[in-house]
């Protein structure tokens, strides 16, 4: 994860002091790229702890195509939503978005249902009737040399109906002649401290899941950034993180899948980071 830390340092040293939508203020820099070879280990941040079950549950939720934050809570905590009404114990990274932007948009918001609109999972699994995930898998199987293996969440017609427009906008997949599946993701807006370690792990996991279904080996994950920023309320945490020495990357252990639908048979506990060790947690408030 050295490249990630180097980018944090670069933004601190060379970024612009800017205002932002949340009113928090940021140090921002535009147009960057980092790369990870998944054969060398799973790119989980070690200079602070990674909320791994949060990563897994969100991806499973995306792949279900859900628009309900309380469904994410069910996946994360493995309980029925009727048992998850205490948000001090059973909130998710999408709870604040549902309770703020979702409510502003007029979506249903109760103790057991918190709608977000046509967010990532809806676009992935039902973009005007198109299941992008199944199409992507079919296209990678039938035409591995193709240059149209795209997964997109940026549905312009629906942007204003989403509780949060997509930050990680699109990804492209590439099958090399040696049987490696690589992925490049473009992120228009990147919270470098809180969000990006989560995003790296999420797309590396998606890439590995797709490689598993396709009987390929995960290759490179390439992360391309538009507006890469550090919120002013996390500057001190970033400085502390940069003093820490990265630890050895873990290995991802997951079930063998014969189809993407087979994911329905598994839970967050079936995806394990073997050998994962990290420095203590570093916390900062999420700017919404």
Set out the residue ranges of the language-model regions:
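Terminal, non-catalytic protein-protein interaction segments that mediate quaternary/complex assembly
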Residues: 1-288
């Amino acid at each position: 994860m050295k490249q990630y830390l180097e980018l944090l340092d670069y933004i601190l040293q060379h970024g612009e002091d800017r205002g932002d939508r949340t009113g928090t203020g940021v140090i921002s820099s535009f147009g960057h790229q980092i790369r990870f070879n998944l054969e060398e280990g799973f790119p989980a941040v070690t200079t602070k702890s990674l909320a791994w079950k949060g990563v897994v549950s969100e991806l499973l939720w995306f792949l279900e195509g859900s628009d309900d934050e309380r469904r994410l809570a069910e996946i994360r905590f493995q309980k029925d939503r009727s048992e998850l009404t205490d948000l001090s114990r059973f909130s998710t990274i999408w709870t604040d978005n549902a309770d703020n932007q979702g409510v502003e948009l007029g979506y249903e918001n109760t103790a057991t249902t918190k709608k977000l609109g046509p967010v990532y999972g809806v676009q992935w699994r039902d973009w005007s009737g198109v299941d992008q995930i199944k199409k992507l898998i079919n296209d990678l199987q039938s035409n591995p040399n193709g240059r149209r293996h795209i997964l997109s969440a940026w549905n312009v017609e629906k942007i204003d109906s989403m509780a949060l427009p997509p930050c990680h906008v699109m990804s492209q997949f590439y099958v090399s002649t040696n049987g490696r599946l690589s992925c490049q993701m473009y992120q228009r807006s990147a919270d470098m401290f809180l969000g990006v370690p989560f995003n790296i792990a999420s797309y590396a996991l998606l890439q590995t899941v797709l490689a598993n279904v396709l009987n390929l080996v995960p290759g490179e994950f390439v992360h391309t950034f538009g507006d890469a920023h550090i919120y002013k309320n996390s500057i001190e945490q970033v400085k502390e993180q940069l003093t820490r020495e990265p630890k050895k990357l873990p290995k991802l252990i997951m079930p063998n899948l014969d189809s993407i639908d087979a994911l329905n048979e598994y839970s967050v506990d079936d995806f394990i980071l073997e050998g994962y060790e990290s420095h203590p947690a570093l916390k900062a408030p999420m700017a919404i």
